[in-house]
Amino acid sequence: MTTRDCIHAFNESEFSRLLGMEILEARDGYSRVTMDCAGKMNPGGVAHGGAIAALADQAFGIAENCAGVHRVAVSISIHYIVPATGRLVAIAERVQDNGTTDTCRVMVYEGDRTVAEFTGVAFRVS
């Protein structure tokens, strides 16, 4: 799959459309994905943690799969730092690649505020 095909596939997936995600940039080991929090609030009036985690996971998946190598997540962790109510941007960067598994760090921002830190480990299937 080319990077262009990858971007198209992720942008057109039902999950991306459901949550209103949009890929801003993607290449092997890197992605920037955005999502508006509107309609994704918890009862406290701030972005639902599941929506934030979904955005980070989407950025992770794109960064790990946009070079024609198929990878699947084997573990993820997320640390929420501050609540959010507006447009979020997730920036994913591969920080380690040992040939079988990769580690990717995703930072989620609302403007210049860090909302969450996410770490994902991916297994190389092909």
Model-derived segments and spans:
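Non-catalytic linker/capping segments at the edges of enzyme domains
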Residues: 1-32, 38
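A generic structural signal for short beta-strands and their flanking turns/coil linkers
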Residues: 17-19, 29-31, 70-76, 86-88, ...
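Hot-dog-fold acyl-thioester-processing enzymes
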Residues: 34-59
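Beta-strand residues in well-ordered beta-sheet regions across diverse protein folds
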Residues: 34-36, 91, 105
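HotDog/MaoC-like acyl-thioester-processing domains
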Residues: 83-87, 95-126
